[in-house]
């Protein structure tokens, strides 16, 4: 089935918007309460219904980051960046994930992109220092 996308939107319109907003709020609440296992399940279910939900992709990736599953986190960060390619928070966690996997070249690429957006970003400067640059 082909989903048609709106004229100015990169994502398809959500046919079950009210229910998905409710699920998103539940997901955020679980995350805020640090119930990561439940939040991960809730976020994954939400992404099955709304696969292009930028914030949910970032938050699920963040949970995987906290669980030290950096490769899995990066896949969610990449999907999130397909929607919002200049999201500094996503880029920064992706850079940290690459650093944890000793993929310094990729971490540097993320840092360079952040510097294009925010040249004075302190976490990026610190990360680049840690990477000996």
Mark where each language-model region is.
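Alpha-helical segment of the N-proximal tetratricopeptide repeat
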Residues: 16-55, 66
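Register position in tetratricopeptide repeats
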Residues: 32-33, 66-67, 100, 130-133
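Canonical positions in the second alpha-helix
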Residues: 45-46, 79-80, 113-114
